[in-house]
Amino acid sequence: MSTGLRYKSKLATPEDKQDIDKQYVGFATLPNQVHRKSVKKGFDFTLMVAGESGLGKSTLVHSLFLTDLYKDRKLLSAEERISQTVEILKHTVDIEEKGVKLKLTIVDTPGFGDAVNNTECWKPITDYVDQQFEQYFRDESGLNRKNIQDNRVHCCLYFISPFGHGLRPVDVGFMKALHEKVNIVPLIAKADCLVPSEIRKLKERIREEIDKFGIHVYQFPECDSDEDEDFKQQDRELKESAPFAVIGSNTVVEAKGQRVRGRLYPWGIVEVENQAHCDFVKLRNMLIRTHMHDLKDVTCDVHYENYRAHCIQQMTSKLTQDSRMESPIPILPLPTPDAETEKLIRMKDEELRRMQEMLQRMKQQMQDQ
């Protein structure tokens, strides 16, 4: 027994370390290499905020990123708002936290939903999103692709008024016009105007109307099976809380001996970061801490790819039409397959299917052994 203990406590010799080094290739450091390169390069994120005036869009952005992007903003009178057309304003700021740099771009849409006639008031916004896709497509197709500036909109926070009974026609029109182009995250603005039971009813009504009108809002990705239980629980809470009921505030008030951001009312204090009062913390966690990269991935892999495929299809169609017009020899349509050819194709498909099934059975047998 004592010999075994002495053997277990034996220190590794230089020869043992050399043997370990020989077995170690080194590609396990790839995540660290990617991390260092990404941190050095920095990250960029473009967030669009949309909704009618007075719903606290700029205040919420300030609360999310602790950065004032609207220092030079001019407040318009009621008459100016009615006559104002929809504008697109960009605010860009560089934020650094613990050595990680983020280039944040906020795309604001003043004038949206404020006119008497709001027919297709979302057209300038959809045009802007398409213009960013077009610019990225041109840069990607050019000769110099090393430093492409990504100005594509990665997420749109759409503010819904808490004073209605669900979605208004302008809300439905906006989201249906953009849901195939950008990740839409609907928010119930100024949640402190409602009691908890009213918030629950409004959330349920909005979810029903989103399904009814076929609106595709941003869907949270499913958790992997190897994720820990805390992350799975957080993911479930996010999905159950959508659409998020939010409150924004730039004012620091004192509550229970602590200084917190919130709003002071005669009946009490509403704390922005108190999850019993609103979903601000859930929105911040989703947008910044857990799903920012997924929002960028969906923008690139789904929305932009759809736009890119459409552009390539149009270009191919135009080239085909031009070649038909310029060709001295008429291009005949391809002959339709006869019955014998179709029969042969079906036989080949059936043969291929049988081979695939046989390979699948062999693979299963090998796994069982």
From Swiss-Prot:
Name positions with the PTM Omega-N-methylarginine.
Answer: 168
Give the span(s) annotated as G4 motif.
Answer: 189-192
Which PROSITE patterns does this chain map to?
G_SEPTIN (PS51719)
InterPro entries, alphabetized: G_SEPTIN_dom, P-loop_NTPase, Septin
**Subunit structure of this entry?**
Septins polymerize into heterooligomeric protein complexes that form filaments, and can associate with cellular membranes, actin filaments and microtubules. GTPase activity is required for filament formation. Interacts with SEPTIN2 and SEPTIN5. In platelets, associated with a complex containing STX4. Interacts with PRKN; this interaction leads to SEPTIN5 ubiquitination and degradation. Interacts with DYRK1A. Interacts with STX1A; in the cerebellar cortex.
What does the UniProt record say this protein does? Filament-forming cytoskeletal GTPase. May play a role in cytokinesis (Potential). May play a role in platelet secretion.
Q: What is this protein called?
A: Septin-5
This protein's species is Homo sapiens
Underlying gene? SEPTIN5
